[in-house]
């Protein structure tokens, strides 16, 4: 190699060595990016957040255009349990700081977007997160290196040409590109991102809105009171969130146009594929809707002589002229900054606007590239809340736990309990856990049984579609069977065409629990960890493969699954049947009697009484058990027997009966 070659090699070496390196690079300081930064910061990891604007949450400085968020801020629940309250707090991020709850930033049920901007700024400052502001990453590529964690580094270039090197890339840029239309006359269409939000600009106008989503209805709601009429047009039928149980569908706060449409107050809703349409502007500046094929067959250059559908069909629904046409079709992910070497592609069908990722939120094309937040919604699009703060705060935590195990050898957090605590552990989680509640059928709790079912290990909020890879992803073993705790709606209850208010829609009887419609806990039992093939060929509409046994806890109007007879007893009997054991608790006297009369003791007596632990019954404890419907009141039975002339001796009231139905609780 000559002198010039040495100089080039030296220059390249210096360029590589001068790259600032971070183990974790996060793109975007929105809610998802800050949430991941908070977890990385608390774990003491080497990370940097890159934000193109001068402050966090720049999306909320512009959107929603009419400034009202549709994520609820329920400040009062009647409960003091912080985890339970997060079920109904759709705006807070997860942290250990009680001051960083959104209820301290707004009293409104539907807050103003500026409150979210203020909240995110405080979140970053109070936690001391490492954010590099005014840094717009314009290009991302790969640099293969066998020494790197994933076999390559991610090379980021900003608007100034500065290059950064990362071992793991976490993309939390959201959906930043407005979805456009492309038909003749589309140049006349105004976009949601730029149209006026002042109702005075629409007084006495005829307005056509393209789209049937929340942004379209938000726009219509703002101008309903001043326009002549508002028509809405989209390819698909309107999807109402209370019917689909999907928070991303049209919410009641914005559906005023549906009211005026159905009550025939001039406003209207139409369905048609936009790609077949065209817009024509007449000499008065009005816009007419026509069909593309009519333009193709017309040679006239005069706007007023172009054929319209009403020429052949005089009751064509859209024969009226419009003053304005507004596009409200949502957004798509910005793929433009990613080099082809990353193989980051879009999803399929309705999820085309999202990157194609695994259920672990990792790109299918590049190991070590994870998609977070709204952009990760392809995993649960139109199913759960993964595209929104109250959903992705938990999926981001799941990704962090996966990374902690993969790169730092820290297993998925778990707690080990004796088997006697199995029923109570499940009941506690289904009644208070927020991640299970919001990310239903996406994140599930996993219970790993120990040998001989003497104990169990409890893992919270694992991505259930990755169940076959649980051991590899978590560092935990599932050799002796497992339970999966999921929250589900009834399989035939949700859909845009469903009547969810029909009479007798709820299930109240225990024996009909499997027919429950509303969100309720479902427990799956597997003797062995399902395989990839099991997951792939699971029954239609099932979130998991067919289990060894399954149990539905009957739906509850109060979402309070603590009823001793209606909820706890059926669950405990199900668990006992799966494990072939007795999960009841006993007083010391009963355990003593069992040791004299049984060859096999219940686990409670084995793990408590035989280790010199346990509780002796007293009059007050027995009375509490009777009042709680946990024990039979034998005193009352004895008095009744005496009145009937039956002089048989009733069991001692301070000792649990071996054959009492009440004792089964």
Swiss-Prot record:
InterPro entries: Auxin_biosynth/cation_transpt, FAD/NAD-bd_sf
Signal peptide (UniProt feature, chain positions): 1-17
Keywords: Endoplasmic reticulum, FAD, Flavoprotein, Glycoprotein, Oxidoreductase, Signal
Glycosylation sites: 136
GO cellular component: endoplasmic reticulum lumen
Principal cellular location given in the protein's record: endoplasmic reticulum
Cofactor(s), names only, from the UniProt record: FAD
Record's comment on post-translational modification: N-glycosylated.
UniProt key word Zinc: no
Region (Disordered): 642-665
Localization: Endoplasmic reticulum lumen
Gene Ontology molecular function: any one: flavin adenine dinucleotide binding
Any one of the GO BP annotations: ERAD pathway
Sequence similarity: Belongs to the FOXRED2 family.
Quaternary structure and interacting proteins, as annotated: Interacts with SEL1L. May interact with OS9 and DNAJC10. Interacts with TXNDC16.
Record's function text: Probable flavoprotein which may function in endoplasmic reticulum associated degradation (ERAD). May bind non-native proteins in the endoplasmic reticulum and target them to the ubiquitination machinery for subsequent degradation.
Designated name of the protein: FAD-dependent oxidoreductase domain-containing protein 2
Organism: Mus musculus (Mouse)
Gene name tied to this protein: Foxred2
